[in-house]
Amino acid sequence: MLAIAISRFRNAKTVRFTQGATLARDERVYYCVMDTFEIITKEDVARAVYEAIPRIACELPGDVLAALEEARKAEGPTRGAFVLDQLIENARIAACDQVPICQDTGTVWVCLEAGPDMLVPGDVFAFVNDAVARAYDEARLRKSVVRDALFDRANTGDNTPAFTDMHFVDRPGARVHVMLKGGGSDNASRVVMLAPGAGREGVVNEIMDCVRVKAANACPPLVVGIGVGSTFDKVAHLAKSALLRPVGERSSDPRAAAFEQEMLDAINATGMGPGALGGRTLALDVHVETAPCHIAALPLAINMGCSAMRRATVELAPASKGRGGR
């Protein structure tokens, strides 16, 4: 293998390493030792975020709009049908006039996924924040971030910082997920550390309690993301990541897929309906992500996604490739 000087990577100051990479250092520069590698630049990540924000603020994803239209066909003469008519017409006007779907243009969640042998510059977070600030200013989107949750609730004035995660995954390539998350849907969400003895029944009961108590405040019909497992800090990420999956797409795990359908049927059987004004469709879909956990724990997170489920995924092409050999 060949030691590749980091200074060659568009002057990147730091690099995050995939599994199998090794690190060496001399007095001048860090080196990354890998068989092969691909580079994605911070400029490409920032561009993806900058271009996605105004688009998803004004245009519902096709799968979400199609699900609203299907729900309207199935609704019948209910007050929920009126809600769906308004949501569909609102989406049409927003896309046509390029104005926000909702006055709450949300906080920005960015999730960068990098596959095996991908090199990512460490200061990408600063570039993402700059892209968010420019996008919100130029598109005249509402700024909704305060400086400190407890001690200084002054608006930052540019909707930064974005809430950015970086993950290395087994899937090849790199992609950026962008989501605009309104306050109402997150406020209706929940994280619970159940005892293992609660089991499947306890998980179901907690989900249904959250739905009955909180769903009306989350602007339904909803997409419900459910995370089960991992740890206290990671289970919420599982639930939010579940919202990235298109409406109608079931989990690749047949057990999780069956549970998704079971929970979707149970949630819609409440009769709360669109806008919680009565009807057939309280949820457009339920997505479940599971993970291992400690033997003494059963972490559960429920993340509500509102009817304005604003998200996009952008595949990134590597800026260059390299191969080593020592």
Task: Go through the PLM ranges and name each one.
Residues 1-11:
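Extreme N-terminal basic, low-complexity initiation segments
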Residues 2, 28-30:
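Short, intrinsically disordered or compositionally biased N-terminal tails of bacterial proteins
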Residues 6-8, 17, 31:
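Intrinsic disorder/low-complexity segments, especially N-terminal tails and targeting/processing regions
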Residues 20, 30-326:
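Non-transmembrane, aqueous-exposed alpha-helical and coiled segments at domain scale
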Residues 13, 19-22:
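Short, low-complexity, charge-dense intrinsically disordered segments
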